[in-house]
Amino acid sequence: MPDHSYFSNLIWQIADLLRGPYRPPQYERVMLPMTVLRRFDCVLAPTKAKVLAEFERRKGGRLEGDALDTHLNNAAGQRFHNHSALDFERLKGDPDNIEKHLVSYIKGFSKNVRDIFDFFEFEAEIERMREANILYLVVSKFCDVDLHPNTVPNEQMGLIFENLIRHFNELTNPLQDFPLHGGLAG
C-alpha cells in the first residue's frame, strides 16, 4: 500500500495544472477542497445506491432539513451523505457540463459538508477554473486518485492533509526560514 508521501506527491502533480491561472500560494484554494471532495466521494461510494434509494423514498415527504439529513446519513453509514446521482466518474463523463454538475454534486451533500465548501468559497474557484479551461482536467485527475479508506486509512489521510497544508504554508511565506537579523532590516 502506498504511503502518504505517494498520495501527497500525486496531488501535487495535479496542482501543476493550476500553474498560470493561479499563483502557487493560491493553489490551496483548489487543492484542499478538491482533496476533501474526492475523499468524501470515495468514502460514500459503497453506500451511494442505498442513499439515493432512501432519498427517492423520502423526497417530497414530511421530512426535510436536519431530519432528512439524519435519515440519509444513516443510509450512508456516516455523519454526512450525498443525495446527488453524480460522483467523480459521472462528472468526468460529461466534460461539457462539468461546472454545472460539479456545483450540483456539492449541493447534494448534507448541510455539514456544504458548509465546508461554502467556507472555502469553492463555487468561485470552480468558475475560475472553468474560465481558465482547467476545471475538467483537475476533476479528471482527481477522479484517478483512490482516496477510499481501504486504500488510504484515516491516519494516513490526516498525514496527507498535514503535508499539503505544510506545503501551502511554505508557498505562502517563502522567506520564513530566512530570519532578518540586523543589517537588512535596519
Spans of model-derived segments:
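Non-catalytic, mostly N-terminal accessory regions of nucleic-acid modification and defense proteins
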Residues: 1-186
